[in-house]
């Protein structure tokens, strides 16, 4: 990088530019239990040594700047600086390496994902000395976790609210995502819930557009779910999207949902922002609302392997900020999601203590110290033939969400919901009897279809539908 060009200054310090590694590369440093630890995938510009690039990441995401400043003498740099304490090669990649950086906890505001990300994934990602930079994982120390409320309710409380146990929950996104009137939208909600689904969902695009204003949608959807509850004897929900252009409008929608007595609202947490999300999560806990989270815009940030931020980091951030559900990919559907990587961040969402496991992309052991868990939502291009794989991959503590796989049924919405509920119950029963869902899945579905004409029709429609493309973001070859 820049050569050392120090000159004497009359104020008693050496002005100029010096290599970052002199201050911020500390291979002998032993990280503290209270440090936030980060694993960065670094691709430096040609000629930039790994140690200098790693130190630059630590500096520019903590206390450093491009030149020596006299106010450095007014603080304790050793107390507040980030430290690159380890450099690790990436198998099969000569131009990349993993830089491990430790950040003192005092650098971050308590209970603020916004502040944490502003430092760790801020201006450093535009640093010219780096060709690319990706945040692969974070270790959030117990001391910082305890400053967050986390999910409004968590997995067990949600099951108790819904009185549903021993199986994944079933959902459906109402389609077409845009253009329906509020009354027709409510009709679709009613038909899906009556047919056996636990939830229906606003699409992430649905806020308050001219064809369907939010208040009208909320009213018709509430009417639909209460009618379906009365007919089925089951508790039902519809994810009413409270996302809005301002936090004030978002909260107005959440308050109206609470007044209607519905069980759950929804937020687009990346486009809406972490400050808005945490605000809404606190309201939901205080007022008994579940909170469904959509991750719209995540792939802009996390899909490319050498630059951006891995979704496991966004998942950890969401658990801290607050949400009871979050979309997590399907492994088998139309959206990006390699199996081992997906299972890794599903563990980070649901479990209380997760060991380091590089085979699943987990760089650090994470202790959530009883912060409530988040239900992963599998959604996007899935249908009844995927049910055995989804049940086997995600287990009971998940939401399986079939949009086109419900509303695309040749007989209508309610039969589409029936087909999915029958397929799910068949898979859960087969699993409980000790059958191998991965090996016998298709046979289990065929057997169930003999007793359900709705399922048989769905099986016929989607028997040839597959999404067989290789994932872009895959684990490094060791």
UniProtKB/Swiss-Prot annotation:
One of its GO terms (cellular component) is chloroplast. It comes from the Eukaryota. Keywords: Acetylation, Calvin cycle, Carbon dioxide fixation, Chloroplast, Disulfide bond, Lyase, Magnesium, Metal-binding, Methylation, Monooxygenase, Oxidoreductase, Photorespiration, Photosynthesis, Plastid. The modification N6,N6,N6-trimethyllysine is found at residue 14. The keyword Iron does not apply. It catalyses: 2 (2R)-3-phosphoglycerate + 2 H(+) = D-ribulose 1,5-bisphosphate + CO2 + H2O; D-ribulose 1,5-bisphosphate + O2 = 2-phosphoglycolate + (2R)-3-phosphoglycerate + 2 H(+). Coiled coil: none annotated. The record marks 334 as: Transition state stabilizer. Substrate binds at residues 123, 173, 177, 295, 327, 379. The disulfide bond which can form in the large chain dimeric partners within the hexadecamer appears to be associated with oxidative stress and protein turnover. Its EC number is 4.1.1.39. GO terms for molecular function: magnesium ion binding; monooxygenase activity; ribulose-bisphosphate carboxylase activity. GO terms for biological process: photorespiration; reductive pentose-phosphate cycle. Mg(2+) binds at residues 201, 203-204. The active site is at residues 175, 294. It is found in: Plastid, Chloroplast. The modification N6-carboxylysine is found at residue 201. Residues 1-2 form a propeptide. The modification N-acetylproline is found at residue 3. InterPro entries: RuBisCO, RuBisCo_large_chain_AS, RuBisCO_lsu_C, RuBisCO_lsu_C_sf, RuBisCO_lsu_fd_N, RuBisCO_lsu_N_sf, RuBisCO_lsuI. NCBIfam families: PRK04208.1 (NF003252). The basic functional RuBisCO is composed of a large chain homodimer in a 'head-to-tail' conformation. In form I RuBisCO this homodimer is arranged in a barrel-like tetramer with the small subunits forming a tetrameric 'cap' on each end of the 'barrel'. Heterohexadecamer of 8 large chains and 8 small chains; disulfide-linked. The disulfide link is formed within the large subunit homodimers. Belongs to the RuBisCO large chain family. Type I subfamily. This is Ribulose bisphosphate carboxylase large chain. It comes from Panax ginseng.
């Amino acid at each position: 990088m820049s050569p050392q060009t120090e000159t004497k200054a009359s104020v008693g310090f050496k002005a100029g530019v010096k290599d970052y590694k002199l201050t911020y590369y500390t291979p002998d440093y032993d990280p503290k239990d209270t440090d936030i630890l980060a694993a960065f995938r670094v691709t430096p510009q040609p000629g930039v040594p790994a140690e200098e690039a790693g130190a630059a990441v630590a500096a520019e995401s903590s206390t450093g700047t491009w030149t020596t400043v006299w106010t450095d003498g007014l603080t304790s740099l050793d107390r507040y600086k980030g430290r690159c304490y380890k450099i690790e090669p990436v198998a099969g990649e000569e131009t990349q390496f993993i830089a491990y950086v430790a950040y003192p906890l005092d650098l971050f505001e308590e209970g603020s994902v916004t502040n944490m990300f502003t430092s760790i994934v801020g201006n450093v990602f535009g640093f010219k000395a780096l060709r690319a930079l990706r945040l692969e994982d974070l270790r959030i120390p117990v001391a910082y976790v305890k400053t967050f409320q986390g999910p409004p309710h968590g997995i067990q409380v949600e099951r108790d609210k819904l009185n549903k146990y021993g199986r994944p929950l079933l959902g459906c996104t109402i389609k077409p995502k845009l253009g329906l009137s509020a009354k027709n939208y409510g009709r679709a909600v009613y038909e899906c819930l009556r047919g056996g689904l636990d939830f229906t969902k606003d699409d992430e695009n649905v806020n308050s557009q001219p064809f369907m204003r939010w208040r009208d949608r909320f009213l018709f959807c509430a009417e639909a779910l209460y009618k379906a509850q009365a007919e089925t004897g089951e508790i039902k929900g519809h994810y009413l999207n409270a996302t809005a252009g301002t936090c004030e409008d978002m909260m107005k929608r959440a308050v109206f949902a609470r007044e209607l007595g519905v069980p759950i609202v929804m937020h687009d947490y990346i486009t809406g922002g972490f400050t808005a999300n945490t605000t809404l999560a606190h309201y939901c806990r205080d007022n008994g609302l579940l909170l469904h989270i959509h991750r719209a815009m995540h792939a802009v940030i996390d899909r490319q392997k050498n630059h951006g931020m891995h979704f496991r980091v966004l998942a950890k951030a969401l658990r801290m900020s607050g949400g009871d559900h979050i979309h997590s990919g399907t492994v088998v559907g139309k959206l990006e999601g390699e199996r081992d990587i997906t299972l890794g961040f599903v563990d980070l969402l649901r479990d209380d203590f997760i060991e380091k496991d590089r085979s699943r992309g987990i760089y650090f052991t994470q202790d959530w110290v009883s912060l409530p868990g988040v239900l992963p939502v599998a959604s996007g291009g899935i249908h009844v033939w995927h049910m055995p794989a989804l049940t086997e991959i995600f287990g009971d503590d998940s939401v399986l969400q079939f949009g086109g796989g419900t509303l695309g049924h040749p007989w209508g919405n309610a039969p589409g919901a029936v087909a999915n509920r029958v397929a799910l119950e068949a898979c859960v029963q087969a699993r409980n009897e000790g059958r191998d869902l991965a090996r016998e899945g298709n046979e289990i579905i065929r057997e169930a279809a003999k007793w359900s004409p709705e399922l048989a029709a769905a099986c016929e429609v989607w028997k040839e539908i597959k999404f067989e493309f290789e994932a872009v973001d895959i684990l490094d070859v060791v």
